[in-house]
């Protein structure tokens, strides 16, 4: 190990310096240096390389499950599509709710049967496709409000107008009585 000398820094504090003229505080044990290099190597890897997953047995099984799930839910989609084609008004929920609920139930049941979560990407794409095909032109129908009959409207306008002078008179009359008592 190199001998240490103590020197003063320009500000007046003492620094321990090795014979190689390096501050002793910067010397690191080899194990700590190796750990630091490993950490820097892990941090400097690109995020793209971290996101790449190598196919494992589970991921291949999951891919097989998704393919089987897709083949099992296609009849659900075809049944829904043919049922919806027979409906005249696609925007009337009472007419289409049964078919839509059956599609959703079928997608969820098949996902559960294959051990997949619901909603999953395939189920979401089928539901989105259903919305794009059948409900794209549907909008929320808001009831249009009309004016009340004239006699009700006049009563609602005249009542506050007549009430205001009476209330002003009452306030003025009560405030005069209050001043006289004080």
From Swiss-Prot:
**Location(s), subcellular:** Cell membrane
Name the site position(s) for Required for CALCRL interaction.
146
* Cytoplasmic-facing ranges: 173-182
Does the record bear Transcription regulation in its keywords? no
Q: Which InterPro entries match?
A: RAMP, RAMP_sf
Q: What is its main location?
A: membrane
GO cellular component entries: adrenomedullin receptor complex; cell surface; cytoplasm; plasma membrane; receptor complex
| MF GO annotations | adrenomedullin binding; adrenomedullin receptor activity; coreceptor activity; G protein-coupled receptor binding
Could you list the residue ranges that cross the membrane?
151-172
Signal peptide feature range: 1-45
What are the disulfide bonds? Answer: 76-106, 91-138
Q: How does it sit in the membrane?
A: Single-pass type I membrane protein
Q: One biological-process term from Gene Ontology?
A: angiogenesis
Report keywords, A-Z.
Cell membrane, Disulfide bond, Glycoprotein, Membrane, Receptor, Signal, Transmembrane, Transmembrane helix, Transport
Q: Which residues lie on this side of the membrane: Extracellular?
A: 46-150
Q: Sugar-bearing residues?
A: 51, 92, 137
Q: How does it assemble?
A: Heterodimer of CALCRL and RAMP2; the interaction forms the receptor complex for adrenomedullin/ADM. Heterodimer of CALCR and RAMP2; interaction forms the AMYR2 receptor complex for calcitonin/CALC and amylin/IAPP.
What the record says about family reads: Belongs to the RAMP family.
Record's function text:
Accessory protein that interacts with and modulates the function of G-protein coupled receptors including calcitonin gene-related peptide type 1 receptor (CALCRL) and calcitonin receptor (CALCR). Required for the transport of CALCRL to the plasma membrane. Together with CALCRL, form a receptor complex for adrenomedullin/ADM. Together with CALCR, act as a receptor complex for calcitonin/CT/CALC. Together with CALCR, also act as a receptor complex for amylin/IAPP.
What's the protein called, per UniProt?
A: Receptor activity-modifying protein 2
